[in-house]
C-alpha cells in the first residue's frame, strides 16, 4: 500500500546495479535510459558497488524531489522515493503511514546510504510535498528553481554546480524529462508539471554537465509516448538531446 510493487522494484534495483557495476568496472560511461525514475536508486547502488569509497555528487534535474519514503508517501509510488534510498533516510519526523514488516524489510534492502545530502543538487524541482520540503530544509539541499535558471543563466548555474561538487570524486546526472516545461515540450511523461525548464536551457545544461570531467554516469527517464499530446514530441526532443550529447568529444 505504501510502497507499490516494491518486490518487483527490488529486482529492478539489483538488475540495474549489477549492470552499472559491470560497465564502470570496464571503464565504460553508462548511459541509462529508463521509464520510471525509481530505477535511479539501482543506478546509484551500482555506482556504490563500483566505487565504494568515492564521494558521489548527484545533479537531479526533475520537477519532483523524489524524497518520499514508505513512511511519508501520500501515493505509495516508488518513483517518488529513489533519492531517499540513496540517502538512507526514513524521515521519521514526518511519518504519516504505518508500514508493515515486509515492506520495511524490502525498503531496507533498497537503501544504499551512499549519497550525502550536501552532495546533492536539484535543478527545476517545483512540485513537492511538505515531507520532502522538510528534508530539503533540514539538509539545506540546493534547488536551482526555474526562475533562478532563467535569471542567472545556464552558464552561471553550471559554474556553481561544479564549484559545489568540487570535492566529489565523481558526478552522476539524472535527467527526468518532466523537468522541462510541458507546454513547450509535451505532456509525454508520467507526471508533467507546468512552468518548467525551457528545452534549450535543458540542452545547454546537459551538455555542460556531461562535459565536466568528473561526470561518470548519465540517465534520462520518464519518456512516455502513450501520454504524449503531440504525437511523439517528447521522444523526439529526448532523442535530439541524446544525439547532441553523444557528439561531445569525450564520446568520440
Spans of features found by a protein language model:
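Conserved alpha-helical scaffold segments that buttress catalytic/binding sites
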Residues: 1-252
Amino acid at each position: 500500500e505504501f510502497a507499490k510493487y516494491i518486490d518487483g522494484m527490488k529486482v529492478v534495483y539489483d538488475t540495474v546495479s549489477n549492470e552499472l557495476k559491470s560497465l564502470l568496472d570496464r571503464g565504460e560511461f553508462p548511459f541509462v535510459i529508463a521509464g520510471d525514475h525509481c530505477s535511479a536508486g539501482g543506478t546509484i547502488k551500482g555506482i556504490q558497488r563500483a566505487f565504494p569509497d568515492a564521494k558521489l555528487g548527484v545533479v537531479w534535474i526533475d520537477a519532483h524531489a523524489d524524497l518520499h519514503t514508505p513512511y511519508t508517501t501520500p501515493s505509495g509510488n516508488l518513483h517518488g522515493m529513489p533519492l531517499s534510498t540513496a540517502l538512507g533516510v526514513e524521515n521519521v519526523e514526518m511519518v504519516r503511514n504505518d508500514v508493515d514488516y515486509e515492506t520495511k524489510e524490502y525498503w531496507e534492502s533498497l537503501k544504499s546510504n551512499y549519497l550525502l545530502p550536501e552532495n546533492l543538487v536539484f535543478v527545476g524541482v517545483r512540485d513537492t510535498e511538505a515531507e520532502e520540503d522538510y528534508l530539503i530544509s533540514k539538509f539545506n539541499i540546493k534547488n536551482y528553481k526555474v526562475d533562478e535558471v532563467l535569471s542567472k543563466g545556464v552558464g552561471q548555474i553550471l559554474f556553481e554546480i561544479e564549484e559545489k561538487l568540487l570535492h566529489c570524486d565523481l558526478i552522476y546526472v539524472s535527467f527526468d524529462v518532466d523537468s522541462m516545461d510541458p507546454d513547450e515540450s509535451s505532456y509525454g511523461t508520467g507526471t508533467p508539471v507546468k512552468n518548467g525548464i525551457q528545452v534549450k536551457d535543458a540542452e545547454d545544461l546537459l551538455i555542460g554537465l556531461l562535459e565536466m570531467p568528473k561526470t561518470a554516469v548519465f540517465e534520462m527517464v520518464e519518456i512516455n509516448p502513450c501520454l504524449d499530446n503531440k504525437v511523439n514530441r517528447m521522444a523526439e526532443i529526448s532523442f535530439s538531446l541524446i544525439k547532441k550529447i553523444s557528439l561531445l568529444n569525450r564520446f568520440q
